[in-house]
């Protein structure tokens, strides 16, 4: 896989596929970025290219617009923040239409000098970006490729998507992997190939079905698999416990039974949970044993004894991978489990990886220093699919 060090970019136009898919608060007059982690992660690649005299064209998606312009998902606020982080202006090439690589974008790109940068509008404003139709996708990829002379793939959070800007444009231009993609790959290789032991994996989130592939891939390799979040209730049901009104995938109970039989005492489940009479910040709550959830009660967090149990199993771990919150951390009464587990991971001396998505958001929301972890990934789904051993279209396109 080539790197940007292998490209002679001075004076040339370079299309960089970054992942600037950040959360925006639109409650005020001006949209505000609430977590700029992905923007910050994109800077090393863009800055390195600019320092070498490249004319950089940054591309990204934001949210899930339906293949047409939607001002709620414009990248214009991101252009401003990217410029602040780079210490130089970022020309925004959006014109309010879905013609992402059209006449206006070509005009902005033509005006770039060496060491200057532009940001195109949200790629998903064009139906060609995510189309299942190869001809439609190819047409959009052709338009993007026509803007540049080189391509750099740096959107690790999107490499599992067979989208035009990720998997098709690299087939049309000399290409290389960006700094972020290379860093993410190095981290994931440390997690999957001969990790330092003891090796602990913490999985949370809503559904067992979403994490089944990574559970099956990692279970033979780990010394402890700690299960929290909504998915733990299907495991508890597999033990024969009632789970009240908690999230339950009934069709996954037999699968969980088989996993528990395979994993034995390496699979660690909560011993107590925080329950509520309804899904709300002001709900009535209680801490109950994991086998004592009453009818009509919802499990929304692991309990204090479980948090201590998980922290104990994390103590002394040489490698830790965490993906998925322990509870509904966005609501204060149900944040303690996620906070406690995050702090336990942060306090360790081993190699610790936060697996992107909601876990990364939890670290920032709960005010835990990011530098307390060895790495905070920008790719939730991409990380999981890599660890499952799947072929990721965006990586395959760069590796040729």
Swiss-Prot record:
Q: Which cysteines are joined by disulfide bonds?
A: none
InterPro entries documented for this protein: Phosphoglycerate_kinase, Phosphoglycerate_kinase_CS, Phosphoglycerate_kinase_N, Phosphoglycerate_kinase_sf
> Which compartment or compartments is the protein found in?
Cytoplasm
Task: Give the GO cellular component terms, alphabetically.
Answer: cytosol
Provide the family line: Belongs to the phosphoglycerate kinase family.
The record's HAMAP family line, in alphabetical order, gives: Phosphoglyc_kinase
How is this protein named in the record? Answer: Phosphoglycerate kinase
Question: Per UniProt, what is the name of the gene that codes for the protein in this document?
Answer: pgk
């Amino acid at each position: 896989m080539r790197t940007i060090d292998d490209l002679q970019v001075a004076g040339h136009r370079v299309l960089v596929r970054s992942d600037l898919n950040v959360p925006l608060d639109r409650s005020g007059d001006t949209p505000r970025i609430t977590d700029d982690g992905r923007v910050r992660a994109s800077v090393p690649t863009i800055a390195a290219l600019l320092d070498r005299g490249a004319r950089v064209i940054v591309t990204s998606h934001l949210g899930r617009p339906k293949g047409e312009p939607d001002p709620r998902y414009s990248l214009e606020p991101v252009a401003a923040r990217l410029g602040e982080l780079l210490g130089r202006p970022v020309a925004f090439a959006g014109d309010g239409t879905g013609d992402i690589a059209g006449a206006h974008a070509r005009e902005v790109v033509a005006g770039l000098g060496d060491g200057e940068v532009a940001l195109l509008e949200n790629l998903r404003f064009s139906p060609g970006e995510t189309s299942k139709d190869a001809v439609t996708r190819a047409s959009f990829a052709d338009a993007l490729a026509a803007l540049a002379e080189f391509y750099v793939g740096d959107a690790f959070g999107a490499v599992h998507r067979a989208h035009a800007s990720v998997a098709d444009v690299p087939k049309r231009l000399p290409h290389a992997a960006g700094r972020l993609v290379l860093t993410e790959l190095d981290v994931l290789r440390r997690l999957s190939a001969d990790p330092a032991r003891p090796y602990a994996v913490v999985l949370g989130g809503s559904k067992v079905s979403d994490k089944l592939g990574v559970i099956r891939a990692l279970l033979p390799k780990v010394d402890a698999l700690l299960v929290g979040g909504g998915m733990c209730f299907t495991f508890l049901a597999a033990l024969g416990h009632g789970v009240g009104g908690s999230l339950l995938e009934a069709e996954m109970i037999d699968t969980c039974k088989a996993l528990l039989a395979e994993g034995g005492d390496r699979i660690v489940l909560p011993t107590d949970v925080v329950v509520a009479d309804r899904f709300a910040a002001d709900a009535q709550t209680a801490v109950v044993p994991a086998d004592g959830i009453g009818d009509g009660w919802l499990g929304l967090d692991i309990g204090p004894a479980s948090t201590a149990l998980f922290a104990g199993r994390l103590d002394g771990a040489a490698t830790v991978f965490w993906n998925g919150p322990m509870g509904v951390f966005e609501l204060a009464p149900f944040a303690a489990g996620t906070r406690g587990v995050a702090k336990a991971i942060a306090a360790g001396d081993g190699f610790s990886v936060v697996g992107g998505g909601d876990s990364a958001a939890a670290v920032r929301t709960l005010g835990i220093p990011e530098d307390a972890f060895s790495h905070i990934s920008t790719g939730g789904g991409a990380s999981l699919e890599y660890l499952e051993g799947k072929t990721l279209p965006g990586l395959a396109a760069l590796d040729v």
